[in-house]
């Protein structure tokens, strides 16, 4: 549904009231018995650090930021998907193997965990992330249902350096299919991207896709056409692929432990859900 209309806001990482914007998360969905959250706004270097795959502040991309929904632009950090570990691999374009990514291992699964605090990290469970991805025509140019099948159910290991389609960790990023399913249901027939027709892809769904935030951001999914392409959402709202050394915005995603309970809140941005132990 539309950006602020879906009442799926959760306050996470603080007991401060009212909940600071930087602690707002949103419920992507319930998968089996696991609730999946994603950070509402893009991560800062204070949250994810200036080591790992940090490149620079997002404003230094000199990108189109006119679609950005919030007012925190100057603090948003931009990270490569997998570049700093080996800056010469694949002619310097980075690698699309998630298990070797410092964004994964340092920024998300070390710094985020340390900065969010023990009490809150205990509310997050380790999960199996589907990281094989698939080739361009099986995800980017497909509607949500087909993209989900090719991304989550039948990922591939083509061109990966570890021949794995799964990675176990607490923190990850959204899937392409998460983004696509966040739009109103009648938009699920759209392709992630159709090169010359915005009316047939997710550019025409931004006003009714609550996951769309207006900046260029990474997903967790490889584009398995080569060793260095990764799927991302661009500022116009469509799904594309780019080199893993590119530096984009980040929104950490994770699954809550079954022991976490609902305390209060209606789920609106101003009255987010408060969690208990």
Q: What residue ranges belong to the model's regions?
A:
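Long, domain-scale functional regions
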Residues: 1-277
